[in-house]
Swiss-Prot record:
The record marks F16 as: Substrate discrimination. This is DNA polymerase IV. Its main location: cytoplasm. It catalyses: DNA(n) + a 2'-deoxyribonucleoside 5'-triphosphate = DNA(n+1) + diphosphate. Its EC number is 2.7.7.7. It comes from Treponema denticola (strain ATCC 35405 / DSM 14222 / CIP 103919 / JCM 8153 / KCTC 15104).
Length: 395
C-alpha cells in the first residue's frame, strides 16, 4: 500500500511588516506599510492592522496614505528580510529534507513519511509553528494536503497564524466551499469571463464540462480550471529543473503589464538570487525566466552562457530572455527567475581563469557588500538601482 502524500505550504504572515514590528516593538498592533515612499511608490507588504483600512500589496502609496493616514510607512530592508527568511528556512530542514522555497516568505515541505518522527500532520504542523515562533519571533500559516496546489490554497484559509488541513478525499468538498476569488490562479479577468458566461460559483464550474470551460477561457486555462476545482493539480508547483538550482518567484495580487514595473520586479528577483548565490558559495551559467499570464498560461525560456557574475549581469540576461518571450499583450500574474546547473564556486585563486579582471572586481565588490550586510544586519551598502527603488518602486 502506497504511503499517503503529505505536503505543507508554509507562508510567513505579512512578512516584511512583521519583521519591522519584531525589530521595532513600538510598531506592534499598529498599521505598518512597507513600500516605496515617493509618489510613484507602491505597497510591498502591509500588516494586518493596515489591511483593516483596505490597504493591500501593489497599491499605490498615495492611495494607501489616503486610506490609512495613521499608518507607519517604511522603506523595505531586503537584506534584513533575507536574514529572517533564512532563519525560517533553516528550521524547515529540521522537519524534512525535501523543501521547495518558492519565494522569500513561503515554501513547500514534503512531509510524506514524517509521521514516524513527528506524529500526525496536525501535530507536526503545530510543532513547526511553535518552533518558528520561539526561534524567530515570526508567525506562519500552514496549509496541509495531499498535493501542493490544495496546500497552497489551504494556507490562506486561516490567516494569520493559522493551520488548515484538507484530508485525503476531502479535496472536492474543500474546493466547492471556496469563493471563486479564492481559487488560486483565477484572476479578475478570468472571473469576469466566467461570470459573463453564467458561472458564478465553484460548484457551477465543477458541474461544467472541460469543453465548455475551454470554450470560455481557452484550452490551457479551461483545462487548468477543470482540474483545479477537482483538486487534481499535482504538477503546478513541481520542480522545473532536475539539476540543482536556485530560484525565486513572485505572484502578484494585481497583474503587471508595464515594462517599468516588470523591470523593477525582475531586478529585485535578481538581487534576491545573487544574495543566495553568495550565501551558498555557488555559481551557475544557466539563467531561466518563468512567466505566468493572468489566464494561467505558463511559459519559460532559458539560456546558458558565462558564469553569472553579479546582480546587474543576472538582471540584464534575465531581462533579455523575458522580452524575447513576453507576448506584450497579456497581463502577468507571476514572474520567476532561476539559476540552474548550480555547482560549488571555484577557489579564489582560479577565479581569473573564468572571469575578466573587470568582472572579478565587480563580483568581489558585490560579495563584500553581501558580507558586510550579513555581518551588520542592516543596509550598509546596496546597488544604486535598489536605492532608487527604495524611493520609487516595489520593495
Amino acid at each position: 500500500m502506497a504511503t499517503e502524500k503529505v505536503f505543507f505550504h508554509v507562508d510567513i504572515d505579512a512578512f516584511f511588516a512583521s519583521v519591522e514590528q519584531l525589530d521595532n516593538p513600538e510598531y506592534m498592533g499598529k498599521p505598518v506599510i512597507v513600500g516605496g515612499q515617493s509618489e510613484r511608490g507602491v505597497v510591498s507588504t502591509c500588516s494586518y492592522e493596515a489591511r483593516k483600512f483596505g490597504v493591500h500589496s501593489a497599491m499605490p502609496i498615495l492611495q494607501a496614505r489616503k486610506l490609512c493616514p495613521s499608518g507607519i510607512f517604511l522603506r523595505g530592508r531586503m537584506d534584513r528580510y533575507h536574514e529572517k527568511s533564512k532563519e525560517v528556512m533553516s528550521i524547515f530542514k529540521d522537519f524534512t529534507p525535501e523543501i521547495k522555497q518558492i519565494s522569500v516568505d513561503e515554501a513547500f515541505l514534503n512531509m510524506t513519511g514524517m509521521e514516524k518522527i513527528f506524529g500526525t500532520p496536525k501535530n507536526s504542523a503545530l510543532l513547526l509553528k511553535k518552533t518558528i515562533k520561539e526561534e524567530t519571533g515570526l508567525t506562519v500559516s500552514v496549509g496541509c494536503a495531499q498535493n501542493k496546489y490544495i496546500a497552497k490554497i489551504a494556507s490562506g484559509r486561516s490567516k494569520p497564524d493559522g493551520l488548515f488541513i484538507v484530508k485525503a478525499g476531502e479535496e472536492i468538498d474543500f474546493m466547492k466551499s471556496l469563493p471563486l476569488k479564492d481559487v488560486w490562479g483565477v484572476g479578475g479577468k478570468t472571473r469576469e469571463r466566467l461570470i459573463a458566461a453564467g458561472l458564478t460559483s465553484v460548484p457551477q464550474i465543477f458541474n461544467s464540462s472541460e469543453h465548455l470551460l475551454q470554450s470560455i477561457l481557452g484550452n490551457a486555462s479551461g483545462s487548468f480550471l477543470f482540474q483545479a476545482v477537482r483538486g487534481e493539480l499535482y504538477d503546478v508547483f513541481s520542480d522545473d529543473v532536475k539539476s540543482h538550482s536556485i530560484s525565486t518567484e513572485r505572484t502578484f495580487e494585481h497583474d503587471l503589464f508595464s515594462h517599468a514595473e516588470i523591470d523593477d520586479v525582475m531586478f529585485y528577483l535578481a538581487s534576491e538570487l545573487m544574495y543566495r548565490i553568495f550565501d551558498e558559495k555557488v555559481k551557475g551559467k544557466t539563467v531561466s525566466v518563468k512567466i505566468r499570464y493572468n489566464d494561467f498560461t505558463t511559459v519559460s525560456v532559458q539560456s546558458t552562457g558565462a558564469v553569472v557574475n553579479d546582480t546587474q549581469d543576472l538582471f540584464e540576461r534575465a531581462r533579455e530572455l523575458f522580452y524575447k518571450k513576453f507576448d506584450n499583450k497579456t497581463p502577468i500574474r507571476l514572474l520567476g527567475l532561476c539559476i540552474m546547473n548550480i555547482e560549488s564556486d571555484i577557489p579564489e585563486a582560479q577565479t581569473e581563469l573564468f572571469y575578466s579582471e573587470k568582472n572579478v572586481k565587480k563580483r568581489k565588490i558585490e560579495e563584500t557588500m553581501y558580507t558586510l550586510t550579513k555581518k551588520e544586519g542592516k543596509n550598509i551598502l546596496k546597488p544604486a538601482r535598489l536605492l532608487k527603488k527604495d524611493k520609487d518602486g516595489l520593495e
